[in-house]
Amino acid sequence: MLSRESPFTRRGAVSPNLLFMPSSHTSIDEDAKGTTKHSETAPIDGKKEDDQNVMIGAVGATWKEKLTVVLTTLFLTFGANYTLAALPVLKPMILKNTYYRGHLIDNAKYGVMTSASNLINTVLPFFSGVLVDVYGPSYIALFCSTCIAVGNLVLSLGASRGEFNMINGGEILMGIGNVTIHMCQLKIYAHWFRGSTVDGPGLLGLVTGFDVAIGRVFGLMGALIPAPLMEATGKWYWGLWLGFIFSIFAWALCLVYVLHERTLPAPRKIAQSMLHRRCMSPWQHVTAFLGQFWDHVVQVPAAFWILILVQLLQTGAVASYESNTVDMMVVTRGEDNVASLKSAAYKYSMHYAIPIVLTPIVGLGFDKLGYRNAAISVCACFYIVAMSLMGFSQVHPVVPMLFDAFGYTLNSVPFLATVPLLVRRQTLMGSAHGILKAFNASGETIMQVAGGSLQDRAVRHGKPMREKYDYMLYLVLTFKGLEALYGGLYHALDRRYFGGVMRMTEKQRVKKEAELGEQSYGSLCRPHAFWTVLGCVTSVLIVAAAYGVFIHFWITNPDEKPGTA
């Protein structure tokens, strides 16, 4: 259990947590008949007796309640995931039909476009993660669903009119909701499906894997639908309008979950840190929130900071490759026509189809077998083979796409399944996922824009079109080569400093948690000033770099032969 005192709190100073001391606390009393009775207030961060409750989650929840949660929560990212998957498929058409200041856009501008939804998420998740912890995920998710729907509308209008700036504006609006709503999902899953000493081993790994798998289904739809729809209607942008319709459906499901949660008894509801402060003035809310934000940041364990610092730019390397895969197949193995685009899109669908089945199995495997650290190196090796075969050989694209699908299956699940183990307090879960999302968004922005710029540079240096991806591939392969070595690094860290939590099965973890009580798994599973400062400084630097790269390539006119690079 993490220390309640921040490493930055001065002796005798008042901790920001004291600003949020609840007027009443959740308690469990035994009545004369031996039944369990809960108070009317949900668990709130503040007292020592609350700590166990905020780590347990929805104790005694029925499977009917859990099924309702799953069916409404899984679809919250429907519209966003579909649209993000459709953009890479439509890259050849985007380059031919989208204008900036009267010029067709180039590959660097396309990189700006695909990373626009990430731009706001270089900063927003730091705060939205705390917002999810402070106010609960349901209403935050409803706001995010609204942003996604409006963003999809603006993006579709921009595509219809061929306006680069309008498409970017829609992407940014969609980005405001996309990452934050996923944090809301993860917070909800951790509350309802995390194992405890009361209910026994949970199914968090399985549910997390199933969430990732259903996201792959939405991505599969985004990969398969746009090309046939374009062929049937003669309009390349109709696939994006379908994403707007899906986002409206997701918004309606989010509203259903909010209404469902209001019917639950207080002990079933997710812990909120400011439940009793709803009547504060706006300024008091701001100052209290900033205090809570800082308190959450400094209580994040060192192991979590180490995890995201080591993985810096790795997600961006994958995003840079994936956003260009369809165009890479067309350029290196096909012709510049709708038939080649349609064929490439079908092959690209393997990227989503295979993980639909395998991802839940991987998540369940982590619950039953452990060894999340080993999956990181295996994932990197799959990507190295996929990228090398796709970019530097003429083998049938199905072969590299098969390796790509296996890599994509393992890409995020080990980290999503590990974060709740390193960050044991429920009221810090949103903050931790927010920091992780912000780091990933910054890395994706930098790497996607850099990848597009390297493609344009290759063309300007006289490389033939079929070799325009060489420079970008050299960059991303370097990062994946490093990641292949990280499994051994994580094994050593986990064994010595993390208490073996990455290698444990869910059953072993619950048993050890019962033995440790409030003690930490390992020496780095609690806050350390050095790692907190290093993480915060790195956050500022990578966010500044992301904004600098993005703005520079947004306002720069396309070079030489726009749209043909």
Describe the residue ranges of each PLM region.
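Cytosolic juxtamembrane N-terminal segment immediately preceding the first transmembrane helix
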Residues: L2-Y82, A86-L87, C525-R526
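Extracytoplasmic
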Residues: T68-Y100, Y321-V326, L416
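Extracytoplasmic gate region of multi-pass secondary transporters
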Residues: L87-P88, P301-P360, M447-Q448, V543-H552
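Conserved MFS/SLC helix-loop-helix module at the cytosolic interface between two early adjacent transmembrane helices
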Residues: V123-F164
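Helix-to-loop junctions at the C-terminal end of transmembrane segments
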Residues: V123-P137, V357-Y371, Q455
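Cytoplasmic helix-loop-helix junction between adjacent transmembrane helices
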Residues: G170-A213
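Symmetry-related core transmembrane helices of the 12-TM Major Facilitator Superfamily/SLC fold
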Residues: W238-V256, D470-Y490, L534-A544
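C-terminal transmembrane helical hairpin of 12-TM major facilitator-type secondary transporters
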Residues: G370-F415
